[in-house]
Amino acid sequence: MANDPGFTGGTLDRADHLRNDEAALARMRADPAARVLLLEGLDPVPGEGGGLGWRSFVAHDDRAELLFLGLDGDAPRFAALRPEEPRGGSMAVLQLLHRLPRHEVAIYGAARSLVDWHYRHGFCARCGAVTAVFRGGWGRRCDACRAEHFPRVDPVVIMLAEHAGKVLLGRQPQFPPRMYSALAGFLEPGESIEEAVRRELHEEAGVRATSVRYVLSQPWPFPSSLMIGCIAPVESDAILLDTTELEDALWLDKAEVGAVLRGDPGARIMTPPPLAIAHSLLRAWVEE
């Protein structure tokens, strides 16, 4: 779909049934068609054709553990977990990702989240002992207490409050000049998606949702969020900002949002680029 956000549309077969099969993993590592994703820290390295860069196993660093990403047809694809922790990835990587094919952005996103999770979880959360990779890279096991740990995903609601044909966009202090986006926040323990949307809208902007409608979702690998996009009609357009979260908020109608999405030079604000779910959510609302 044209409105699908970045990091979706992956084409690898994740082949979960092979992750516990050590013999199959060994065969795949020995397959001449196997490739290892090139990363500089946590950032992708462009390949010769302008897509993701891949390395054959001949050039593979033997010190690195291999994380099984999946199958591209019959060809195994891996990411490398190196002994040294990577330097923090830069958000400037988003500029490169805009130039990659959509399915490759999805591959990179999954690899980045997985590699980053391993670097953050080298020790057991139960007993503190060192953990080791298992399940082809989709888990870590503690030999001391036998606890097993698996990659986590942090759910985030991102939503458009809607009233009288307009939607509410907010601006955080760290945003680039003129940038506004949909309001967002992490789900808390014991909360449903609908409850989180209502709470976040009221906390950040003082508006009360009368209903909540799910629209679409997006994995966001910085480091491991799942963005859950919703639209929520609200009782009133009166705004009461939480200035610890937002420095400004405003209502825009469909004509104004359409102008922003088209990049019209006269548009009074900017919104996140097509890679971000906020862009897809706004486009879905305009096209309703």
Segments from the language model and where they lie:
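A short glycine-rich, hydrophobically flanked beta-strand micro-motif that places a catalytic Asp/Glu
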Residues: 210-217
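Cys/His-rich short segments
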Residues: 109-160
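Surface-exposed, charge/polar-rich loops and edge strands
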Residues: 191
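Active-site-adjacent beta-strand/loop module that shapes the phosphate/pyrophosphate-binding cleft
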Residues: 218-243
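Conserved hydrophobic/aromatic beta-strand scaffold that supports enzyme active sites
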Residues: 68, 78, 123, 158-160, ...
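Nudix hydrolase/Nudix homology domain
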Residues: 1-121, 176-180, 243-288
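N-terminal strand-loop-strand
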Residues: 140-182, 186, 208-209, 232
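Hydrophobic alpha-helical positions that pack around
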Residues: 183, 197, 201
